């Protein structure tokens, strides 16, 4: 049975009743390209949250990093100079919570001058490439919502001085969105309501965009993936890359020491013997407060969404089905009469994969400690915690002129 023949799919059927035959022919063609099996995850949404046995994972802490600085840095710079390292910037979001109706990376974080979030990230990268004397290919993941604006922004600002040949854009894959009964919403009478497939879909989206050929042509062996909102992070950090290579691990994760046992941050640990991330709400009180003999928290390091993955391993797991997280969200759509609805409360489900599940598909992962005040300044709000205000103060503390 075709999806539009299913009497349950009232939104699709209502739109088809209003459409012309030509519009319906085009709509049917699009409907046949959509993966409808994703709806089955509504029934299984609780099972994805069933977890195994957690155990602590020892981090490479700052004192050890300082003691082995020359060793780690040499290994990392060698990899960069040999053209083995690429970077992926996850930048599919809009700056809605920051009062922007445009890509989040276009936010001006300056005070007395213009300094854009994208610009600061590229400055961080160029600190490394200037030292290495070699460029790192940067792949920027956008979304259907912000792709054109993002590309235009980079062109207008001449890629902030980075060579254009080393910057490539790709669009994150989209999946359908539905109500709580699994009835697929329509964005308009001719378009299904779709949403990005979560930050775990970045490598699959690169493959779909045909970028695997580019990765192979460049000879990349390591991919550093990171999120747009942390303006302080070091990208393609030679020390981090070197520590991961020297450890023999196939992945690494930058982590910060937790500020408090109950801090709302995912913790890098092991789950059934493999690296994993335990979300703060999955940790028991006993886990959250357990301490080592020296008084440090046993589960004491939180991830900051800056990972290094073996490219070879990424290809090996590319065809594996990642867990689908069914997330309640507010989904704009047209109702059965064709009127636009912008809900104020969650009215259905979106389906997402998460990069933290990618970590669990690795055989090993090295938790690499960075100093919070030097490398973690996320901008999620205009004011308050993790805001533009707090990020500006941290940037100033690191010597950035605003």
Could you tell me what each predicted segment is?
Residues 2-168, 176, 187-203, 212, ...:
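N-terminal glycine-rich phosphate-binding loop and ensuing alpha1 helix
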């Amino acid at each position: 049975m075709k999806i539009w023949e299913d009497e349950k799919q009232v939104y699709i059927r209502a739109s088809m009743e209003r459409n012309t035959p030509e519009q319906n022919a085009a709509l049917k063609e699009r409907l046949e390209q959509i993966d409808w099996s994703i709806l089955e995850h509504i029934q299984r949404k609780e099972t994805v949250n069933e977890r195994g046995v957690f155990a602590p994972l020892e981090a490479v802490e700052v004192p050890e990093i300082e003691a082995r600085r020359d060793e780690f840095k040499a290994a990392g710079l060698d990899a960069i100079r040999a053209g083995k390292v690429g970077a992926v910037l996850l930048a599919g979001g809009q700056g809605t919570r920051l009062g922007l109706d445009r890509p989040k990376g276009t936010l001006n974080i300056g005070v007395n001058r213009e300094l854009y979030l994208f610009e600061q990230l590229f400055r961080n990268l160029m600190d490394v490439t200037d030292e290495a004397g070699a460029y790192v290919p940067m792949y920027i993941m956008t979304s259907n919502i912000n792709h054109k604006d993002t590309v235009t922004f980079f062109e207008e600002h001449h890629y902030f001085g980075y060579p254009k040949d080393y910057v490539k854009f790709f669009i994150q894959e989209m999946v359908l969105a539905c109500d709580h009964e699994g009835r697929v919403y329509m964005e308009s009478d001719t378009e299904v309501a779709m949403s990005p497939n979560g930050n775990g879909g970045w490598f699959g989206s690169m493959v779909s965009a045909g970028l695997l050929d580019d990765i192979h042509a460049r000879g990349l062996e390591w991919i550093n993936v990171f999120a747009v909102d942390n303006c302080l992070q070091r990208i393609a950090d030679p020390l981090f890359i070197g520590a991961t290579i020297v450890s023999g691990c196939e992945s690494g994760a930058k982590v910060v020491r937790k500020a408090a046992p109950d801090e709302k941050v995912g913790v890098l640990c092991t789950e059934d013997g493999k690296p994993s991330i335990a979300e703060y709400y999955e940790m028991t009180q006993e886990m959250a407060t357990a301490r080592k003999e020296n008084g440090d928290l046993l589960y004491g390091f939180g991830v900051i969404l800056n990972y290094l993955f073996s490219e070879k391993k990424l290809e090996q797991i590319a065809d594996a089905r990642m867990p689908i997280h069914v997330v309640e969200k507010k989904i704009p759509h047209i109702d059965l009469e064709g009127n636009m609805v912008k809900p104020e409360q969650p009215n259905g489900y979106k389906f997402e994969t998460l990069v933290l599940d990618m970590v669990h598909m690795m055989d090993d992962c090295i938790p690499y400690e960075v100093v919070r005040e030097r490398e973690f300044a996320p901008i999620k709000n205009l004011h308050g915690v993790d805001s533009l205000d707090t990020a500006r103060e941290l940037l100033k503390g690191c010597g950035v002129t605003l």
